[in-house]
Design a protein with these regions (language model features):
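Structural/interface elements that position substrates and couple domains in central-metabolism enzymes
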Residues: 1-428
Length: 428
């Protein structure tokens, strides 16, 4: 994901880029114009730059290594069994890099990696050079990505900032040259030492996750004391010291970044003898929040869920992506199935991903209205634009019981209650 978006956007800025992956099928698909991920605008940009010769794809790093100045490492760093980042793929790239470089080359880590990874990468590369009995100069750098799935191209082409961790003048000059088009557009390129760059990525995602869990905690308290979390959100978000972003309560965060990065930062601290008490609480709140829709449904039906037909709108962890990694919908659906519910689901783009993950355990609807046919409740998991203004009269006709549980607070409670729905949301 990160590698394809980054490589394509660099090509769009005039850089000649070769994307490398060990998966031959993926490379062949890209060469034939089949994009393996859903990201708005990416397919057109890939094909344009491929057609114009600035973007190519291969399975062989060795075939291009001596023709490039910079190698970006954007492989996955999945959580290990204990929650820490698994660096096997990053270190495998470093090993191959050390085995094959013939001239000065800069290896830049784009993957989200724990603080101290650059030193491990350097050690692996140097060990391979020593085996070859050669003295080829190289540098490593850290250039963490801050891409939001669903808005990744915009984020790359118009970033808030670009963070680059380096430890040599040569590496800084090379990265400065690469990002010069961004400097011309007055975007900030922040050069740091490498450990700081590695920390910035984890700290940024953990801060955003903290805001989400804090607002979910506030929302849950609002329900108990009779306050409206949307009014609270507007009131505190108007404070310039706080701002309004990432203050929306809901049914928890998911995706490939926040859960993994929060856990990895906690584990990094533990390895250094420190406890991240705030982040432990953030993680705990989020795990509980993932069950909030199920809990509201359970309470509405007083626990009698066996045989109930339940519709779910939204499967991806957020709109404008088909990514279901750590999606809250998975928790909700699992709880529903274990209670004996019959579950029918719909998502504008994540249906195939859901089939891959869940198989025949749920029923797959043809569209958003097919989802609610004769159901006993509708659960909103993802705030896709398509779901914002449904035909309420049609929903009333199609549903057995007009119960809506809105996990993203996208509807007006008074309007739906006036129409005859039993409507539940977060924090009101």
């Amino acid at each position: 994901y990160v590698g394809l978006v980054s490589g394509t956007c660099f090509a769009e800025m005039g850089v000649h880029v070769t994307c490398v992956d060990v998966n031959r099928e993926k490379i062949e698909n890209l060469q034939n114009g089949r994009i393996p991920i859903y990201e708005p605008g990416l397919d057109e940009m890939v094909m344009r730059n491929f057609r114009e010769g600035r973007l190519s794809f291969t399975t062989h790093l060795t075939s291009v290594l001596n023709d490039v100045d910079i190698v970006f490492c954007a492989v996955g760093t999945p959580p290990d069994e204990d929650g820490s980042a698994d660096l096997r793929y990053v270190l495998a790239v470093a090993k191959q890099f050390g085995e094959n470089i013939q001239k000065y080359t800069l290896l830049v880590t784009k993957s989200t990696v724990p603080i101290g990874t650059a030193q491990k990468v350097k050690a692996v590369i140097q060990a391979e050079l020593d085996k070859r009995c050669v003295n080829v100069p190289f540098d490593v750098a850290s250039n963490p990505e801050f891409l939001k799935e669903g808005a990744a191209i915009k984020d790359f082409m118009s970033p808030d900032r670009v963070v680059v961790g380096v430890e040599s003048k040569r590496a800084k000059e090379l990265m400065g040259k690469l990002y010069r088009p961004f400097l011309l557009n007055n975007f900030r390129v922040i050069f740091t030492d490498i450990p700081s760059a590695e920390m910035i990525k984890y700290a940024a995602n953990s801060m955003l996750a903290t805001r989400i869990s804090f607002m979910n905690d506030i929302a849950n308290l609002c329900e108990l004391v009779g306050a409206d979390v949307n009014m609270v959100r507007k009131g505190i978000g108007s404070d310039s010291r706080i701002g309004s972003k990432f203050l929306y309560p809901g049914c928890g965060y998911g995706g490939s970044c926040f859960p993994k990065d929060v856990k990895a930062l906690i584990k990094t601290a533990e390895k250094h003898g420190y406890e991240m008490k705030v982040l432990n609480a953030v993680e705990s709140v989020n795990e509980k929040q993932k069950s909030v829709l199920f809990n509201k449904l359970f309470k509405h039906y007083k626990g009698a869920l066996q045989g109930k037909k339940i519709a779910v709108w939204g499967l991806a962890f957020k709109p404008e992506t088909d990514d279901m990694r750590e999606a809250t919908s998975l928790v909700t659906i699992d709880r529903l199935l274990r209670e004996g519910c019959k579950v029918r689901v719909y998502d504008p783009v994540a249906m195939e991903e859901c089939r891959r993950r869940m198989g025949g355990g749920v029923e797959y609807a043809a569209d958003m209205y097919d989802t609610v046919l004769e159901v006993d409740a509708l659960l909103i998991q993802t705030e896709w634009k398509q779901f914002r203004l449904p035909n309420w009269s049609l929903l009333l006709k199609l549903m057995n019981n007009p119960v809506i549980i809105d996990g993203r607070n996208i509807y007006d409670a008074e309007e739906l209650q006036h129409l005859g729905f039993d409507y539940y949301c977060i924090g009101r």
